[in-house]
Amino acid sequence: VSDDPLALENQVCYGLALAARGIIGAYRPVLEPLGLTHPQYLVMLALWERHPQSNRQLSDALRLDPGTITPLIKRLEREGYVTRQRQAGNERTLDIDLTERGIALRDRAVHVPLIMIRRLGLKPADLPALADTLHGLIAAADNPLPLTDAERAALTSPH
């Protein structure tokens, strides 16, 4: 690790981006036999936890824009894993529910977490601490501390 504060290897954002890209890539061969992409897998995980859900509820749960969720749901519908239906009494709300095929897919997908833990060289005992760290980072990113006057000055003043 370099002493240079601007060295690429020292940047948290760079390390997180590489880790995210690498982990998502490692999921590809695991999810392929299930006929799912990683984003589709996330939608299915949310629906296996609770179904039906509205498009908005799924969007909120996954922290994705509804416009990003819609094509994923349409593809899952074409694959026969989910159905989309207008909510009774509210034509503007679309409910997403699992089909029997989507429910059955869970029996195969249940192996994914342990496979991924092994593929990434982790131990199940490592997961609680890793999850705590990730949840802490997510919470910090959701509510970053405001810039101080000194930080603002350092960023705007020529040196």
Report the location of each language-model feature.
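Short glycine/proline-centered loop/turn elements that form peptide/ligand docking sites
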Residues: L34-T37, T68-P71, R75, L147-A150
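N-terminal leader segment of winged-helix/HTH proteins
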Residues: V1-L34, P128, D149, A153-L155, ...
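N-terminal helix-turn-helix DNA-binding core of bacterial DNA-binding proteins
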Residues: Y14, R21-T68
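Charged, amphipathic alpha-helical coiled-coil/dimerization segments
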Residues: I24, K74-D132, D142
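Short amphipathic alpha-helical/adjacent loop interface patches that line ligand
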Residues: A20, L62, P66, R106, ...
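Acidic/histidine-enriched, glycine/proline-rich intrinsically disordered or flexible terminal extensions
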Residues: T133-H159
